[in-house]
Amino acid sequence: MRLSAAPIGAAFLSITMTTQIAQSQVLDLVLPTDNDALFSGDGPAFYQYVERNYKGAKSTPWEGGQYGFVRDPTDTAGGIVYTRFHEGVDIRPLHRDPRGEPLDEVRAIADGKVVHTNLVPGYSNYGKYVVIEHQWGGSSYYSLYGHLSSIAVQPGDVAKRGQRIAVMGYTGTGLNQERAHLHLELDLMFSRQFEAWHNAFFRNDPNHNGIYNGLNLAGLDVARLYLALHKNPSLTIPEFLSGEEIFYRVTLPKSHHFDLPRLYPWILGAGKRNEKSSWEVSFARSGVPLKIEPSDKRVTQPELTYVKNSSIDYSYLTRDIVSGRGANAQLSGYGRQLMRLLTYPD
């Protein structure tokens, strides 16, 4: 019996497309500098220290260069709480010239496209920085490289994994030559309407960096992601974030401008939605959005609908997005503004 070539071609096309989709999910990250002490567990060799003055005692803890709530210790009834969030990791230099200037090459952590370069240190706390867009699983993620001394790429350039894009430096607020480092983030984006939102709420604070302003980017735990990928190279970002604890939930009014589920369709829960439904967004303590589900609760403005129980002031635990204690918890003024960003201009 003679077989038609069409089914074979269709099957081949199906296999090829499936393979391409699977490959598009693969992160295949490389570290951005020669410093690979992260993988040997040598924190002091990998992370740049911070200068701390706590109750008159000065110290230089390397832990302050990690991701998360690692800075500004504060005494509370529940003990010492680190209240300042660090959205990325600070990587120490390995190479310096005789004057002490850092020489480390900074490289793209994965294939992508350069979408932003800030060449004026005073325009951002990041100093000179680069943002590269990566496409994984049909969604855009953004690697950010901060405190650079020089930049070798420009917006629109294709960046290949491991390609030199800059040189490490110490541009930005509060840094000096000794504490030179690369600040690395891997981010989700909140909204493509950020510039209009910023103009409405921060009129006296010029935005020089468009939608790539740090306020519009939610950084995940990139060091933990690197370590997780060493154990499971096929791990995807949705799978990685599925292990994060939900710390608070916010219900948003119905809006046609809600950009987050368009940017990250995987974040949508399976609940059935009708035309009158609001949206409930679940967040990690870091502020990274984890899940979006329809809600029957009718709201006219963003409303806190859940927060993990704690006796500590929530402003210390949530980057000042939630304020108050216990049953008195609510969105702070800044928290309400940030939630407005998600559905702006509604």
Regions found by a protein language model. Give the residues of each.
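Bacterial N-terminal signal peptides
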Residues: 9-18
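Surface-exposed, glycine-biased beta-strand/turn segments
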Residues: 24-128, 170, 207-346
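Small beta-barrel nucleic-acid-binding modules, principally OB-folds
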Residues: 87-98, 132, 139, 146, ...
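Zn2+-dependent peptidoglycan hydrolase active-site motif and core
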Residues: 101-103, 107-150, 177-179, 183
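Surface-exposed strand-loop junctions at beta-sheet edges and helix termini
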Residues: 109, 153-154, 159
